[in-house]
Amino acid sequence: MPILGDATVIAGLLSRSTSNALRVQLTTPDGTELAHAQQKGGAAVLLGFKNGGKSDYTLSSAAGEELRIAVAGTTTITNQNTPLGRIVPSDGAARFEDGGGTVLAVGQPLTGFKADSAWHHRIMSPAGQELGVLTLMRAHTGWRDIEEEAYQLLLNYNVTSLKAPSYGALLKLSAPVPSQLGDVLAAACVDFSVLPRGYIA
């Protein structure tokens, strides 16, 4: 079962569990949870020393599917130890690849300025067609730049006492995407939020 299904607007809301592990909830504008990712625990996480950056996450869909995301310079995504995809930095941008290295889509460098509270990255198909935009929320005010429908997601957004690496991510697609690309983009919402990853030309 694909994680995104037919959803075209997905918010990745970043919070913490009681054990201090980062948690990213992927929801639609009406509040439906598509999946949630949980950082692998440990003493460094519990004590607040591992606050984002390179780490392992489990992305669990509402249908029970689990993906493992190893967030790093090149992020790998696996499904039951089978490579599903990778997020690879490339020329100031990112490639979204399948498990065999075939490019599914490309994330372009941010449009705007480094000081912006929201960094917008256009997502293009290998043929150059725009598929959507993945936005990294660098500040709480970044959500204000988003249209009202998606901004409603912020109403239930909790700001934790331990500073988070970002304020989440928003994925807006022009149309539903194939399931494999959808799963990689769901993982990208986690990756962008917790690394936090932004691409600058």
Predicted regions and their residues:
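Hydrophobic/aromatic-rich structural module bridging two neighboring secondary-structure elements via a short loop
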Residues: 55-83, 89
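Low-complexity or membrane-interfacial segments used for flexible interactions
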Residues: 1-56, 82-83, 91-93, 99-201
